[in-house]
Design a protein with these regions (language model features):
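Binding-site signature for planar aromatic cofactors or substrates
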Residues: 1-193
Length: 193
C-alpha cells in the first residue's frame, strides 16, 4: 500500500542517501517520456521540500529539454525514484517541478556549493517537491552494490575542454526537437583518484 507525504522526512532522506542509484523521469506534453538512471554522489536534499541533483554531460539532454518546455513557473514535471535493494523493502518517489541551473546562471555558485563537482559537470537540476510517495517494494530484487563505473568521469577528466564544450553545444535539443540550453564552460571538477 502506498503512503503519501507533503515533504521528505528524516527517514526518507536517510533512505535516499543510502542508494547508489536513483531514477529520473520527465515528460513534455508532446514528447516521448524520458527515464534515466543516475549514479555517483549526485543527489542532495536542500530542504524537506526541495532537492537537487548534479548532471554530467552525456549522450543527450532530454531532462533539461522536458523541464524547459513546460511554462509552469516552477518548471516541468519530474519524478525521482529510489529503490532499496537491501532490507527493508521500500520504493520512494519524489514528485515535483524541476528546472535546470547551468554554470552561467544566477544562483549557480551557491547551488554548486552543495556538491563535489565532478569532471564534466553540465548542470544541476533543482526540484520543488510537491509530494513524496512510499510503497512496499516487495517486487524489487535484492542486489549487491559493487562499485561506481569510472568510465564517464574518466572520459570527462581526460577531455579537451574546447572539444567538450563543442560537444555540449550539440546537445541543445531533445530527440523530439525540444530546445535545451548548453553549458558555457567545461568544469574540471575534483581530480579523480
Amino acid at each position: 500500500m502506498a503512503d503519501f507525504f507533503d515533504t521528505l522526512s528524516d527517514k526518507h532522506i536517510a533512505m535516499c542517501a543510502k542508494q547508489p542509484v536513483f531514477f529520473v523521469a520527465t515528460a513534455a506534453e508532446d514528447a516521448r517520456i524520458n527515464l534515466s538512471p543516475k549514479g555517483y554522489d549526485a543527489f542532495r536534499v536542500l530542504a524537506p521540500n526541495k532537492v537537487a541533483y548534479l548532471d554530467l554531460g552525456g549522450s543527450g539532454n532530454e531532462t533539461h529539454a522536458h523541464l524547459a518546455a513546460d511554462t509552469h513557473e516552477s518548471g516541468g514535471r519530474i519524478t525521482l525514484m529510489f529503490c532499496n535493494f537491501e532490507q527493508p523493502a521500500l520504493i520512494l518517489r519524489i514528485y515535483g517541478r524541476g528546472r535546470p541551473v547551468l554554470p552561467q546562471d544566477a544562483g549557480w555558485t551557491e547551488l554548486a556549493g552543495h556538491f563535489t563537482l565532478l569532471p564534466g559537470t553540465r548542470q544541476i537540476f533543482v526540484i520543488d517537491v510537491e509530494s513524496v510517495q512510499t510503497s512496499c517494494g516487495w517486487g524489487v530484487p535484492f542486489m549487491a552494490y559493487e562499485a561506481e563505473r569510472p568510465t564517464l568521469k574518466k572520459a570527462h577528466a581526460q577531455a579537451d575542454p574546447e572539444q567538450w564544450e563543442a560537444k555540449m553545444k550539440d546537445r541543445t535539443s531533445s530527440i523530439d526537437g525540444l530546445p535545451a540550453r548548453a553549458t558555457d564552460r567545461y568544469i574540471a571538477g575534483t581530480p579523480l583518484d
